[in-house]
């Protein structure tokens, strides 16, 4: 009898051990290898897309964008706009709580927008919210936002990933340190942030959408080296990696356990020319440089085919984008124009890049060689984030050393104003925003301003087209390509993908 009991105990112990092992094995933990580090977990104070993308683990906005860049409701159920375009009334979902137990309601929305629109807080994304005059909590599920002047793209500001809802209790508790203590309504909550190595998030048990999230944890791990990032997928150290270096794409595609994804993007790559400085103040010089670049060849050499030549200054999937006939490659025409402009022997200049990764280096080298063929000697410099902030974003027109500048822009609102105004409006020269061409045209300024005062889609189309027509003709840029976004993931990971603005969508992610 004693022996029988002993055997039963052993059987029970074996079953328990097996169950524990099974549970441990079944833990759904995902590692995501990304290309750079995170600056902050406060979306309102982050200028980089990656930090805002990771912050979506904890945070949600009132509205968002789907994979087709169409508006969708998130924490909001609906909205209305007054006839004069000044007042936005937003109805909120009921019964949602922040991860610290605080109710999500109209008062929480007010706390966030009051903080964002107060210049005294010196938040990096203040320019998105500076047109808010006041935010009122009408009742627990109704918010009224009054603008200083009509701004028809305002709903797209609420779509922007910066417009996240942070627990007002956490804002009060942590103040300026909120970037280290994220508390939102999202599917995951912070587990660990090792600022030099990784951010780990864990499932939020109180998440408001039934059955989600399906993963137990996500570890966001910065891996600067392209080859290491790709290797981590092959060894199983990571289940998702972005960006995938183009030179590694073909190799990963052959791996039966990995799926390679090339998705559309709104990431436009271009070279701005400082039109306030010689020789770029001459339209013929700018035209010549556009003829000097072989864009189809650039797509092959620098992007391994994962891009398309630019057909405008706004990517095609952005609302109100206009497409034009691409600049043909014509070095003979380029040399003729340079001669007409007074530079028969070309000139010397500088070409800076906002990034120093391998693709940027290839673009710089290719462009340098192309310009040399028409007599232009370009000294190239690939900058890191610190150099870019100091030398480009932090200096005004008089002290700026920018001449030619290779960079990119992703209009995360999905609407043409954010694709045009920060880059071409006269008031947005650095250090205000990112008009690194120091371009100024009163007609363009007027068209962009008028487009924000109307809610009539036909009128907005007319005004944005008029602005883009002028910009395309005056050529303060060399528009290069619109990138495709290349990511890769383990085939047993589903529901995890890259959005066109280079953010991540992972709410439905699961390990099979």
UniProtKB/Swiss-Prot annotation:
One of its GO terms (cellular component) is ATP-binding cassette (ABC) transporter complex. Keywords: Periplasm, Signal, Transport. One of its GO terms (molecular function) is peptide transmembrane transporter activity. The keyword Transport applies. One of its GO terms (biological process) is dipeptide transport. The keyword Membrane does not apply. Pfam families: SBP_bac_5 (PF00496). It is found in: Periplasm. Residues 1-26 form the signal peptide. It comes from the Bacteria. NCBIfam families: PRK15413.1. Belongs to the bacterial solute-binding protein 5 family. The complex is composed of two ATP-binding proteins (GsiA), two transmembrane proteins (GsiC and GsiD) and a solute-binding protein (GsiB). Part of the ABC transporter complex GsiABCD involved in glutathione import. Binds glutathione. This is Glutathione-binding protein GsiB. It comes from Shigella boydii serotype 4 (strain Sb227).
